[in-house]
Regions:
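Residue(s) in the substrate-gating loop at a strand-loop-helix junction
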Residues: 152
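C-terminal helical subdomain
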Residues: 192, 210-301
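Substrate-binding pocket helix/loop in short-chain dehydrogenase/reductase
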Residues: 60, 108-109, 116-121
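Active-site helix of classical SDR
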Residues: 132, 168
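Canonical Rossmann dinucleotide-binding motif of NAD(H)/NADP(H)-dependent dehydrogenases/reductases
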Residues: 3-36
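The beta1-alpha1 cofactor-binding region of Rossmann-like NAD(H)/NADP(H)-dependent oxidoreductases
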Residues: 50-54, 71-82, 114
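A glycine-rich helix->loop->beta "capping" turn
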Residues: 6, 63-66, 86-99, 105-108, ...
Length: 302
């Protein structure tokens, strides 16, 4: 099965370098028309320049593809709306959104300024919200859309000194879970990708030998599958160095602790059993937790 994007229009945010650049090049190489969005700022989000986005556009055009540059900040709702309109005015539609833009403001939580916490949330989470909100009505109208959230192992599992980044990245998974349910009837499929790649964002975070093995282009195949015609939905893929894994948010079978006054003590005594991963499940939606608990309660109380 060949994956191609002929006739499709994609927006890739944070595409002026690193992973976003590789995403834009990968989509264009397989026929997509690409809006290369990049604020052109520093790793911490400061500054602005269209040079990086224009450079990627030049690469795509030199290879025979179609692309336009856009310098909107994903934190600016009006600018994001204008970016989507730019795609519509140029090519008549928007089929794919890759939410990739991000910054880092790493410090331990004790030392972190709340402004730095909020800014990381604004760029990663609200930036994705803005872009997704702007493309959503177009995707609903055309009964087709593919949206990718860039999550992270930090969001899924935690990382020292990245409480702001981790909070934003796990929030994107929750955002994905609900949008996938809401978009299903419109053939809008929403997924998440947790990349491990050597980029400007990861400089200084890992040893050089490790970074050398984690070239950003190795993540692109996972991205292409997650925004393809036959993409899954509500899927989290982790990718790096040529390896791909799937991550799931699971729930154990749990255990009955009852309603008596000693329920806290029972839970403390049974905590290992409650946390036992044998037979754990991936709930199809948020209501499944309540349904599971009601079924157990009904069985015990009747």
């Amino acid at each position: 099965m060949s994956i191609d994007f002929k006739g499709r229009v994609a927006i890739v945010t944070g595409a002026g370098g690193g992973l976003g650049r590789q995403h834009a090049l990968g989509l264009a190489a397989r026929g997509a028309k690409v809006v290369v969005n990049d604020l052109g700022g520093a790793r911490d989000g400061s500054g602005h320049s269209l040079t990086a986005a224009e450079s990627v556009v030049a690469e795509i055009r030199a290879a025979g593809g179609e692309a336009i540059a856009n310098g909107a900040s994903v934190t600016d709702w009006d600018a994001v709306q204008a970016m989507v309109q730019q795609a519509i005015d140029t090519w008549g539609r928007v089929d794919i959104l890759v939410n990739n833009a991000g910054i880092l403001r790493d410090k331990t939580f004790a030392k972190m300024d709340l402004a730095d916490f909020r800014l990381v949330i604004d760029v990663h989470l609200m930036g994705a919200v803005h872009c997704t909100k702007a493309v959503w009505p177009h995707m609903v109208a055309q009964k087709y859309g593919r949206i990718l959230m860039t999550t992270s192992s930090t969001g899924l599992y935690g990382n020292f000194g990245q409480s702001n980044y981790g909070a934003a990245k796990l929030a994107l998974v929750g955002f994905m879970q609900t949008l996938a349910l809401e978009g299903a009837k419109h053939d809008i499929r929403v997924n998440s990708l947790a990349p491990t790649a050597a980029t400007r964002m990861t400089e200084g975070l890992m040893p050089e030998a490790v970074l050398a093995a984690l070239q950003p282009q190795a993540v692109v195949p996972a991205m292409l599958v997650l925004v393809s015609e036959d993409a899954p939905t509500r899927t989290i893929l982790c990718a790096g160095g040529g390896n791909v894994e799937a991550a799931n948010i699971t729930m154990t079978q749990g255990d009955w602790i009852g309603l008596d006054s000693d329920a806290p003590e029972r839970l403390a005594a049974q905590l290992d059993q409650v946390r036992d991963r044998a037979g754990d499940m991936v709930p199809p939606n948020g209501s499944a937790q309540g349904a599971h608990e009601v079924a157990h309660a009904t069985a015990r109380l009747t």
